[in-house]
């Protein structure tokens, strides 16, 4: 969202974004997938991270460590532009209607009542993301005036969340679990409420 705020939905046209640096090195593969997936919102040709130790650990957890190959930028690589993001200074952001680059600090919109909540998608529905949401909902109920849905990114993640009890926590709170497919992101299955805030 910070990149969208800075360069807009057309800022990436004809560009490949490569994310690197000390902050990027700490991100696990699902977090990196969220960022690279959102390159489409920037209009980017593609987005990449180095295939480093984090990638090796992820592939090992998937039983595919033997397929891992380190892929790092050349030491003398040249770039058209370098954009520095200080991850420690970022504040929570939210994309507002009607384009993904209409980005506002959460502090500007946190008092607005919402009628719809959508957790997940292929972009940010990793095990850790959904488990955190489930723990927030544990012992609580979705407000009667709110439609709350959750989409999980993969069958593997869905099964692990189910086995570990996180889907039950969400369902007990009144969250509707969607099928593993495209959905609310492209306006399928959760039509925004008239005059509502989603």
Predicted regions and their residues:
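Fe-S-dependent hydro-lyases/dehydratases of central metabolism
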Residues: 1-198
């Amino acid at each position: 969202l910070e990149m969208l705020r800075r360069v807009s939905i057309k800022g990436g046209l004809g560009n490949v974004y490569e994310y690197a640096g000390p902050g990027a090195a700490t991100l696990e593969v699902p977090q990196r997938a969220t960022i690279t997936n959102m390159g489409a919102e920037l209009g980017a040709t593609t987005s990449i991270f180095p295939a480093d130790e984090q990638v090796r650990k992820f592939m090992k957890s998937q039983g595919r460590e033997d397929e891992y190959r380190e892929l790092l930028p050349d030491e003398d690589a040249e770039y058209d532009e370098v954009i520095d993001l200080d991850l420690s200074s970022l504040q929570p952001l939210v994309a507002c209607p009607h384009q993904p680059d209409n980005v506002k600090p959460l502090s500007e919109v946190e008092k607005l009542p919402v009628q719809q909540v959508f957790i997940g998608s292929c972009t940010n529905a990793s095990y850790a993301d959904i488990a955190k949401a489930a723990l927030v909902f544990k012992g609580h109920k979705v407000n009667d005036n709110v439609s709350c849905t959750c989409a999980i990114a993969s069958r593997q993640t869905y099964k692990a969340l189910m086995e570990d009890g996180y889907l039950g926590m969400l369902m007990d709170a009144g969250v509707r679990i969607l099928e593993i497919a495209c959905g609310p992101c492209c306006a399928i299955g959760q039509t925004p409420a008239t005059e509502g805030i989603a």
